[in-house]
Design a protein with these regions (language model features):
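Conserved tyrosine-mediated DNA breakage-rejoining catalytic core shared by Y-recombinases
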Residues: 3-5, 28, 33, 37-78
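Conserved catalytic core of the tyrosine transesterase superfamily
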Residues: 8-23, 58-59
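C-terminal catalytic core of Y-nucleophile DNA break-rejoin enzymes
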Residues: 10, 57-77, 85-105, 116
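Phosphate-coordinating loops and pocket residues in cytosolic domains that bind phosphorylated ligands
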Residues: 11, 37, 45, 152, ...
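C-terminal catalytic core of tyrosine-transesterase DNA break-rejoin enzymes
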Residues: 19, 23, 27-34, 102-105, ...
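C-terminal secondary-structure termini that scaffold catalytic or DNA-interacting sites
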Residues: 47, 58, 77-78, 82, ...
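Catalytic-site neighborhood detector that most strongly recognizes the C-terminal catalytic loop/helix
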Residues: 54-60, 142-168
Length: 178
């Protein structure tokens, strides 16, 4: 997804909890389960980190501890000031279990087709890789236990991926150098 589409999707969310969830998904590159499980005690404004990990995690999927950027920090501060529960994503003081309907409605309003909640995680990873963030850091950000997983999925989005191989095969330049 492009930056304009991301902004349009967040703006198209009809409810503050849907907008915050979408913003968190992009900012953390987290999975929806991790974002919906997030509690305020794992949002550390002082240190500038968001801890998506659970102590008693029943999931086999890795979860990360990620830094806050300025945009998500501001959104989280606003939400924290109005919080009625321990959960970051809440509605009427209770934990939100699913945002699918609100997310799909936001996609329709933003005129975005074929966008899923997991598309957001993928878009965040692609944005990091295509802007030169090393795959090792992207793997850590995504909570991947092995950088090979990240490499297999996202290496092709790196701006210089395979460029050195292409240069070796530049036979026209090699012939001109003779």
């Amino acid at each position: 997804m492009e930056k304009e589409e991301i902004a349009a999707l967040i703006d198209a969310a009809a409810s503050p909890h849907i907008a915050l969830a979408i913003h968190l998904l992009f900012a953390t590159a987290g999975r929806i389960g991790a974002v919906l499980d997030l509690t305020w005690d794992r949002v550390e404004f002082q240190r500038g980190i968001i801890n998506l990990r659970l102590d008693n995690a029943k999931t086999r999927k890795g979860r990360a501890i990620v830094p806050m950027n300025a945009g998500i920090r501001a959104a989280l501060k606003t939400a924290h000031d109005a919080a009625l529960s321990d959960y970051v994503i809440e509605y009427a003081g209770g934990k939100v279990k699913n945002i699918r309907k609100g997310f799909e409605a936001a996609c329709r309003r933003a005129k975005l087709d074929n966008v899923t909640l997991h598309t957001i995680r993928h878009s965040s990873a692609v944005a990091m890789v295509s802007n030169g963030v090393p795959l090792e850091k992207v793997a850590q950000y995504l909570g991947h236990s092995n950088v090979a997983i990240t490499y297999q999925t996202y290496a092709r989005f790196a701006p210089d991926h395979l460029q050195d191989a292409a240069e070796i095969l530049d036979f026209v330049r090699i012939r001109e150098a003779r």
